[in-house]
């Protein structure tokens, strides 16, 4: 029996399963392999029918299903995206999934079909099912079978006014292939140069402005751009807000009273939602010498967010909170996330808690899940706790040092032993932190400090997450596992090949263990190659995701793992809480049905998590680009992190910013690319630009709109044969003389 890949989305998972199967499968076999039950079978049946109609699946003997192997040829059916209108008013489309090396072909949808109702109100960006008919050179003709999208795709654009009064909407992302749109003087009369808008383009209605977002020279616009570009839900319905404001602290009732335990929260200085609290004390059992009793208490969000209500639907749609440098797009309204579900000090709060008994080596001897009422003793920060354990106490940490903080560190050291024994993958990716000046401009960008206090909380959370997964397994209740597959053999082979060309040794194992990746990282940690090797290892790994089917967590070296500790900001944790409530009979507001399928939920929240990560990275990069605008013309120390035929990718040492040096900006010679050795070599001077090398670079352009930094190589003024690099005019530089700090909304 073939093991199906764990679902990231059902469509992709079905195709991967059938592609990996040695023989055709029936619909029932597919359902069993993917764990599809109940109403989910209806969705699976419809999906299989859609995939067959799209030409991606074939049915053979006894209606057994296989992946179709069809070339791009007349008579075949494909999914395409409409990208424009031709000179004769015909629609122009391109294949949606083009994986061939040849140029992407354009497809004309025949003008004779314009009267077809299937053409009415078709929007540029819409997906359609097309039957290919004929072609000349790289132009095909095709017939629309059906429309696959009901609504026009919304694009994000920056407005530029032309001399004749008309305007142009251009893409705000360098990877966006959409050609943009032209606006007449009448359509653009209210718009200003540099204004960001969301818009749709329809064949029948033309260009329609959906939302005026702000100007590119205003940093408040950066987060808004990501919100609209990635379609992040950011407002709550009146019903959801009303429900959040009706909530009250529950009576003790059947809950466990934990208010006498000195639990504390430990978070960043700028945190406003505190969803986890911790406590530890030495285990008094003489049979467990050196052991610990620890408690992890988590906000009881499930008490306020009931299955199917408006709050639940809003949280599910979002999947998770999204964190930008200047604001948070919360999963729940602030009345919950910053108030009733925030474990503020000295006030009663409903909680779900897991008590664990640890051995001196950090192994969990036993665990017990409770639904309780707690009262946090203090709101501490990572910096405070770290300074306290190092001997620098303040008025808050001084009375807690012996009774609370030192026991926490004692238990942490035990948990750390267990982590080391498991051989957890240790990838440290430095986070950047934007520091704003008093007048609101971006003062500097620094690596975010990382202390043992951060690791302490991480280890306590991991222990609680494991205990939650074990509990649901033991009780036979559904669980949304947090899974991480072992690296794909092809990715490992590519990593090994890259390292071999750089003469860096690595394990010859087909499936390396986390400890073998750690050896590679340790060997290069204090070298200029460190960040590049970390990135290579990270890219070789599978992506962690959610699934009701457990395959374990490779990176953490755990056989069972779930997310339990952040229900304020992750819907997965809320589902785990509900399942625990039902499994342990802790209330009537749990998951309810033991046979419920979590496949579609896993699919959805895995997707929202990926979208959030992309949006967060995009906004951070835009802030970093904006910071560099006043520094155009200055020199920086950089590391070469990528070598291509057309130039070098570099990372700035001080800010972590990444940019590009076009090959034409490499002065004094012409350079050719040695692909296997990852370097550019000068034909005359034999100057070498090698992957991982340090060099001084000069910032040539910082483009906030395209979110890109262009560099040249810095040279002394008396360098012979110096070819000057022309400093590119940058309108963003003029617009960004001072960057104001948007008001925080965390």
Predicted region positions:
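A short macromolecule-binding patch
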Residues: 101-110, 176-183, 656-674, 724-725
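Charge-lined substrate channels and their catalytic hotspots, especially those that engage the 3′ end
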Residues: 1-295, 302-347, 379, 384-387, ...
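Electropositive polyanion-binding surfaces
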Residues: 189, 201, 215, 225-232, ...
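Short, acidic/hydrophobic/Gly-rich beta-strand patch recurrent on exposed beta strands
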Residues: 92-97, 168-173, 649-654, 660-664, ...
């Amino acid at each position: 029996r073939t093991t199906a890949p764990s679902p990231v989305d059902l469509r992709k998972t079905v195709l991967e399963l059938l592609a990996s199967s040695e023989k055709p499968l029936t619909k029932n076999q597919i359902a069993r392999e993917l764990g599809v039950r109940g109403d989910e079978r209806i969705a699976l049946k419809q999906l299989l029918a859609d995939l067959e109609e799209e030409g991606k699946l074939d049915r053979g003997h006894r209606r057994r299903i296989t992946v179709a192997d069809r070339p791009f040829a007349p008579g075949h059916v494909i999914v395409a995206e409409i990208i424009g209108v031709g000179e004769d008013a015909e629609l122009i489309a391109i294949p949606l999934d083009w994986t061939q090396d040849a140029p992407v072909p354009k497809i004309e949808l025949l003008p004779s079909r314009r009267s077809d109702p299937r053409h009415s109100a078709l929007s540029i960006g819409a997906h359609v099912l097309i039957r290919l008919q004929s072609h000349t050179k790289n132009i095909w003709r095709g017939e629309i079978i059906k429309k696959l999208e009901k609504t026009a795709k919304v694009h994000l654009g920056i407005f530029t006014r032309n001399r004749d009064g008309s305007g142009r909407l251009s893409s705000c992302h360098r990877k966006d292939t959409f050609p943009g749109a032209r606006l007449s003087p009448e359509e653009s009369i209210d718009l200003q140069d540099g204004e960001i808008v969301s818009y749709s383009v329809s064949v029948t209605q033309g260009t329609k402005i959906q939302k005026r977002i702000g100007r590119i020279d205003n940093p408040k616009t950066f987060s808004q751009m990501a919100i609209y570009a990635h379609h992040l839900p950011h407002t709550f319905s009146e019903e959801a807000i009303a429900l959040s404001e009706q909530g009250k602290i529950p009576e003790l009732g059947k809950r466990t009273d934990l208010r006498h335990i000195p639990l504390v929260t430990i978070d960043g200085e700028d945190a406003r939602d505190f969803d986890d609290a911790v406590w530890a004390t030495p285990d008094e059992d003489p049979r467990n010498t050196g052991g610990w009793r620890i408690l992890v208490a988590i906000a009881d969000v499930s008490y306020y967010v009931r299955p199917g209500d408006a709050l639940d639907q809003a949280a599910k749609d979002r999947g998770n909170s999204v964190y930008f440098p200047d604001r948070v797009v919360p999963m729940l309204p602030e009345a919950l996330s910053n108030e009733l579900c925030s474990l503020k000090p000295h006030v009663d709060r409903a909680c779900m808690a897991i008590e664990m008994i640890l051995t001196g080596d950090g192994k969990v001897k036993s665990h017990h899940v409770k639904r309780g009422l707690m009262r946090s003793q203090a709101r501490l920060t990572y910096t405070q706790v770290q300074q306290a354990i190092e001997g620098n106490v303040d008025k808050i940490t001084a009375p807690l040092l012996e009774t609370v903080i030192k026991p926490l560190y004692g238990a942490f050291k035990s948990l750390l032993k267990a982590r080391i024994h498991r051989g957890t993958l240790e990838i440290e990716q430095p986070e950047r932190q934007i520091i704003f000046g008093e007048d609101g401009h971006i003062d500097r960008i620094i690596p975010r400090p990382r202390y043992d206090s951060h690791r302490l909380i991480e280890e306590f959370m991991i222990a609680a997450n494991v205990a939650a997964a074990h509990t649901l397994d033991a009780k036979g209740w559904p669980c949304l596992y947090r899974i991480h597959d072992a690296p794909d053999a092809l990715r490992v082979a590519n990593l090994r090949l890259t390292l071999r060309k750089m003469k860096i040794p690595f394990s010859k194992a087909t499936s390396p263990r986390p400890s073998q990746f750690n050896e590679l990282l340790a060997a290069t940690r204090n070298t200029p190659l460190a960040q590049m090797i970390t990135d290579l290892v990270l890219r070789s790994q599978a992506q962690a995701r959610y699934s009701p089917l457990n395959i374990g967590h490779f990176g953490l070296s755990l056989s069972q793992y779930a997310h339990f500790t952040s229900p304020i900001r992750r819907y997965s944790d809320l589902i785990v809480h509900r399942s625990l409530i039902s499994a342990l009979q802790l209330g009537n507001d749990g998951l309810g049905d033991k046979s419920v399928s979590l496949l579609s939920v896993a699919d959805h929240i895995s997707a929202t998590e990926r979208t959030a990560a992309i949006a967060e990275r995009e906004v951070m990069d835009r802030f970093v680009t904006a910071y560099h605008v006043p520094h155009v013309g200055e020199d920086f120390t950089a590391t070469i992190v990528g070598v291509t035929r057309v130039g070098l990718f570099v990372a700035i040492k001080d800010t972590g910013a990444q940019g590009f040096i076009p090959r034409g900006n490499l002065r004094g010679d012409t350079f050719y690319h040695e692909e296997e050795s990852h370097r550019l070599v000068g034909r005359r001077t034999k100057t070498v630009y090698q992957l991982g090398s340090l060099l001084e670079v000069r910032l040539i352009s910082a483009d906030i709109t395209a979110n890109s930094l262009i560099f040249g190589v810095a040279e002394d003024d008396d360098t012979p044969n110096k070819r000057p690099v022309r400093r590119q005019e940058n309108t963003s530089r003029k617009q960004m003389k001072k960057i104001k700090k948007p008001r925080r909304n965390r």
